Amino acid sequence: MSAETENRISVEDLFSSKGRVKVLRELATSSELNISELCRRISLNHSSTKSHLQVLINSGLVEEKVFGRIKIYRYRIEDLRARSLKNFFELWHS
C-alpha cells in the first residue's frame, strides 16, 4: 500500500464534523494562516481547531510549516482531492 493510499480519509470522516468542514473551507479560500487567525475566522477554540488540523494534515489535505515557534497551515491545492474540494466549496457557495 502506498503512502498516498494510507493517508486517505473517508468522505464520511472528512465531512463528519462541522468544525472540520469550517477549517477546510477557510483554508481553501485563504493562502496560509496561523492557528490563532484560523480560530478567529471560524469561531472555534484552539483545541478543537488543532484536533481538526491534525486529521487534515494526516490525510494530506493540509500542510503545516514551522518557523521557530510559529506554525502556519496551508491548504495543499496541488493535491487533486484538495483541488476538487475547493471547487466543490466554490460551487456550493456561488
What kind of feature is each model-predicted range?
Residues 58-68, 76:
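Beta-hairpin "wing" of winged helix-turn-helix
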Residues 47:
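Key DNA-contact positions within bacterial/archaeal DNA-binding proteins
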Residues 29, 71-94:
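Conserved segment of winged-helix/HTH DNA-binding domains
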Residues 25, 35-36:
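Residues within the helices of the helix-turn-helix
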Residues 30-34:
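Short capping segments at the starts of secondary-structure elements
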Residues 1-22:
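Short alpha-helical segments that sit at the start of domains
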Residues 37-41:
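A short acidic, leucine-rich amphipathic alpha-helix
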Residues 53-54:
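Short, hydrophobic-biased segments on the C-terminal half of alpha helices
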